[in-house]
Amino acid sequence: MKLTKRQFQFIINCDVEQMIEFLMKEQGKSMVEAFDIVYNSTIYQKLTNEKTGLYLQSPEYIYDHLQEEMLSNKQQ
């Protein structure tokens, strides 16, 4: 199934919204901090690349990968 650009962007926006909520609720981040984390992550780059198919996964799955990236960045 081929999505229109509008449909694809809607899915991305919904996923980002969920990740922002998770960061705020689970990690106590402010909204600005949460947006900064998401939009500056490699996960966001992959999410917005239709070829990766990451946008087809659940927000929870995507958030788990974001958490792994955040942990990896802390350890460096």
Report each predicted region and the residues it spans:
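C-terminal alpha-helical interaction appendages
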Residues: 1-76
